[in-house]
């Protein structure tokens, strides 16, 4: 219900604003999505799916002296009961903004780096996009002509389990209509 959603978003923002060095908020938002989709294809598949998705988002501004930094946190769940709590989202957004304070620019150099989970997921999104059939067909992929070539170091592995249920991106069947 709308009132409960507003209360959760306000709680998230309030908890975040109570943290040290958090100067302001770009807002907190709770959104809920519900849809019903019907799929049909030439393989004889006709299926109706009911989907829900719930998101809680908080964006903050941290300030120390004259320096200001922004950061955000969010939670996503298919079931509203599994959504990350307002407290956890607010506190994590505050922590991320606070951690950026005092950051500095480095001179260009070659050195080992460590990516945060958020950064690494963005890199994998780019990789998966480059592997997509449509980009290969349109010849717009930076991995064009990479068939049978390693595109990641041997130390990196990608795991996919299409049979998981109740996970983001899960489907009851693939694009060819093959049921899981």
Set out the residue ranges of the language-model regions.
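Active-site bordering "gate/hinge" segments
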Residues: 1-171, 175-177
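Cation-handling catalytic/transport regions enriched in His/Asp/Glu
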Residues: 180
């Amino acid at each position: 219900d709308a009132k409960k959603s507003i209360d959760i978003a306000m709680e998230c923002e309030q908890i975040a604003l109570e943290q040290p060095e958090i100067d302001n908020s770009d807002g907190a938002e709770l959104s809920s999505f519900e849809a019903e989709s019907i799929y049909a294809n030439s393989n004889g598949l006709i299926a109706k799916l009911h989907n829900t998705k719930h998101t809680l988002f908080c964006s903050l501004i941290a300030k120390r002296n004259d320096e200001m930094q922004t950061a955000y946190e969010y939670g996503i769940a298919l079931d509203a009961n599994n959504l990350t709590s307002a407290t956890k989202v607010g506190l994590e957004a505050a922590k991320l903004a606070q951690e950026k304070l005092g950051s500095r620019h480095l001179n260009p150099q070659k050195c080992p780096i460590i990516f945060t989970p958020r950064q690494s997921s963005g890199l994998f999104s780019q990789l998966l996009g480059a592997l997509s059939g449509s980009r290969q067909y349109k010849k717009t992929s930076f991995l064009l002509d990479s068939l049978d070539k390693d595109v990641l170091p041997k130390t990196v592995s990608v795991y996919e389990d299409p049979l998981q249920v109740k996970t983001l991106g899960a489907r009851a069947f693939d694009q060819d209509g093959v049921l899981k």
